[in-house]
Amino acid sequence: MDDKRALLRHTVATVAYRGGKAVRGAPASFAGYSPDGSPRTAGKILAHVGDLLDWALSQAKGAEAWTDSPPLQWDLEVERFFGALQRFDDYLASDAPLAVSVERIFQGAVADALTHIGQLAMLRRLAGAKMKGENYSRADIAVGRVGLEQTSAKREFD
């Protein structure tokens, strides 16, 4: 595996780690939360992240396709998010060629997913379900670990 593809896999694992932190322990009611009453709720944002990951996989396979999925019930949307991460990482881990460049996948879908994970973390605080901050440079993020179960935080703070 070349260095660029390996770095993309590490980034996908980072999305899983940070995304896991953003969704873990969130109440089911968080799915419908929007600070200003707009239709862009936490559940719709997470559904969009799942769509981004599906899009990244379709780009990698050379059959680029976009889906605008309606949000599922919160726990099902969380499962969908991690399932999409797993499918994308499995493809990246394989010997299958990438139909587009690593840079294109990163600058679009993956970077956008990271942005939206940050939005979910901010919405948690606004919704009164805040999560602790963390020094992510010390986090035990490992290539291939893309499920909900992640290692415990090494250095958290309020």
Please describe what each predicted stretch is.
Residues 5, 9-23, 30-68, 100-158:
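Short, contiguous alpha-helical
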Residues 26, 94-99:
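Short, solvent-exposed, charged loop/turn and helix-capping segments
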Residues 55-96:
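Helix-adjacent hinge/juxtasegments
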Residues 20, 24, 86-89:
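Amphipathic, well-packed alpha-helical segments that form the structural scaffold of globular domains
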Residues 1-2:
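N-terminal export signals and maturation junctions of secreted/periplasmic proteins
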